[in-house]
Amino acid sequence: MKLNTLRTALSAALIATFALAGCSSGNNTSGMDHGSATPGASSSASTAGQFNDANVLFVQMMIPHHQQAVDMSDMIVAKSGVDPDVTALAKQIKAAQQPEVHTMETWLNAWGPKPMPEGAPHHLLSEGMLDEEQMQALDEDTGREGQRRFVESMIRHHQGAIHLAEKEIAAGKHPEATALAGHIAASQQREIDTMNRLLATV
């Protein structure tokens, strides 16, 4: 899959999150709790009760983070000559994370417009996301080099996701968001363990 068909970390994925969250000019209520989700939203969002800024930040950051993992997985699945275990892992990652993106988008819509924090692109890069040059290299690499780059990059990517999830678990108030964060931390650690084993063979 060519890079120009993908929503990369610092372009369309972040732009989509900006659009979804809304760049409102309202007051920044950093650290404050907010009321229940917007009436009329999906039952998943509307029945979960209170949320706070930690929940909003978690979702704003995790949506593009997850989307890049999906894009990376699409890249490796499209390549020929990739170890079947690596392809299977990529498909597993996409199958897990794409629905989670949709869930988080629902929450963000229900919570209403919130400005994206300044410095978000830089912060996401520090949480394991690939920049455009790294995504280009992943897209262009073939054979053993390509699959090793994917596995090594995804390990760092997962480590960043776990770090974001741990912050949400510690500070978030929305019960379903914190539950999702716990699931992300546990499932991605298992995948890191799998990828570390794969590095010995690919």
For every predicted segment, state its role:
Residues 19-22:
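C-terminal motif of bacterial Sec signal peptides marking the signal peptidase cleavage site
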Residues 25-202:
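All-alpha RGS (Regulator of G-protein Signaling) helical domain and cognate RGS-like helical scaffolds
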Residues 1-10:
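Bacterial N-terminal signal peptides that target proteins for export
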Residues 13:
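Short, flexible, mixed-charge glycine/proline-rich loop motifs
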